């Protein structure tokens, strides 16, 4: 694959994730957009590792580390969202003002 094509794909995914994160009103959708951003970053890590560092797997290993952190973040985020849904009966970001009772 050509380096520019992969970087353009990653930039599109990153841009879609940022747009979705900014415009999202639902917490689950915001978590999905955050995962999309992290996957775009992983594509960059693997691509640059493949093109510029053929013998060492630093980018690939770091990408696996980011995937593990993203899985933990998704699990904790979904647990928080389900807890907020049980209390407030809504997953909308603007209605989750838990600090002012």
Swiss-Prot record:
What's in the keyword line of the UniProt record?
Chloroplast, Membrane, NAD, NADP, Plastid, Plastoquinone, Quinone, Thylakoid, Translocase, Transmembrane, Transmembrane helix, Transport
- Which domain of life does this protein belong to? Eukaryota
User: Which parts pass through the membrane?
Assistant: 2-22, 32-52, 61-81
What is any one GO biological process for this UniProt entry? photosynthesis, light reaction
* Signal sequence residues: none
Gene3D superfamilies for this protein? 1.10.287.3510
EC number of the protein: 7.1.1.-
Q: Chief subcellular site?
A: plastid
Localization of this protein: Plastid, Chloroplast thylakoid membrane
Cellular component per GO? chloroplast thylakoid membrane; NADH dehydrogenase complex
Report the membrane topology from the UniProt record: Multi-pass membrane protein
List the GO molecular function terms: oxidoreductase activity, acting on NAD(P)H, quinone or similar compound as acceptor; quinone binding
Enzyme kind, highest EC tier:
translocase
Q: Which reaction does it catalyse?
A: a plastoquinone + NADH + (n+1) H(+)(in) = a plastoquinol + NAD(+) + n H(+)(out); a plastoquinone + NADPH + (n+1) H(+)(in) = a plastoquinol + NADP(+) + n H(+)(out)
General function of this protein:
NDH shuttles electrons from NAD(P)H:plastoquinone, via FMN and iron-sulfur (Fe-S) centers, to quinones in the photosynthetic chain and possibly in a chloroplast respiratory chain. The immediate electron acceptor for the enzyme in this species is believed to be plastoquinone. Couples the redox reaction to proton translocation, and thus conserves the redox energy in a proton gradient.
Assembly notes: NDH is composed of at least 16 different subunits, 5 of which are encoded in the nucleus.
Give the record's family classification.
Belongs to the complex I subunit 4L family.
What's the name of the protein?
Answer: NAD(P)H-quinone oxidoreductase subunit 4L, chloroplastic
